[in-house]
């Protein structure tokens, strides 16, 4: 859904009602209700599909939780933001992607990718990302330098 890391970490099953995931965004205080039917065509998953995958055999109020006990947390405990970031980086590094001269992707860059993909689908990404104005959202419309900007010249 392109939500911020802290908001993802804080999501609870109790935030779901009326077929929407309700989020009060940490950073801005924006209140958004995202339909569970929201689908990202690029991966063919809806928010409902993601929520269903969060339900497992560990009882937890949190969507993102530990499914087994570790030395750091009990089963069902909330996974904090720094743990999500650290494990994203570990998974990214295990993928052994050649980033060339660029820097490896960060967890936060998924927010930018989500913005671009949902915008292609016609979703109002300013509202989805919880921004007050379009300029904030436009900063997320970055493809890591993959596309070229063509200079247009007038015909004389």
Go through the PLM ranges and name each one:
Residues 82-95, 142-156:
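N-terminal/domain-start segments enriched in small and hydrophobic, helix-friendly residues
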Residues 22, 63, 106-109, 139:
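Conserved beta-strand positions that form and line the central face of beta-propeller blades
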Residues 30, 58, 109:
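Exposed loop/turn and edge beta-strand positions of beta-sandwich/beta-sheet ligand-binding modules
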């Amino acid at each position: 859904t392109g939500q911020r890391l802290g908001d993802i970490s804080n999501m609870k099953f109790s935030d779901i009602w009326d077929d929407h995931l309700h989020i009060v965004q940490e950073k801005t205080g924006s209140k958004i209700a995202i339909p569970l039917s929201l689908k990202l065509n690029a991966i063919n998953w809806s928010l409902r599909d993601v929520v269903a995958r969060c339900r497992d055999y560990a009882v937890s109020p949190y969507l993102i939780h530990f499914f087994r006990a570790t030395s750091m947390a009990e089963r069902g405990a909330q996974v904090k933001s720094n743990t999500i970031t650290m494990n994203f980086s570990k998974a990214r590094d295990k993928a052994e992607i050649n980033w060339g001269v660029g820097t490896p992707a960060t967890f936060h860059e998924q927010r930018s990718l989500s913005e671009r993909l949902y915008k292609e689908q016609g979703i109002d990404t300013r509202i989805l990302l919880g921004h007050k104005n379009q300029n904030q959202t436009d900063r997320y419309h970055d493809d890591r330098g993959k596309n070229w900007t063509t200079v247009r010249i007038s015909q004389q």
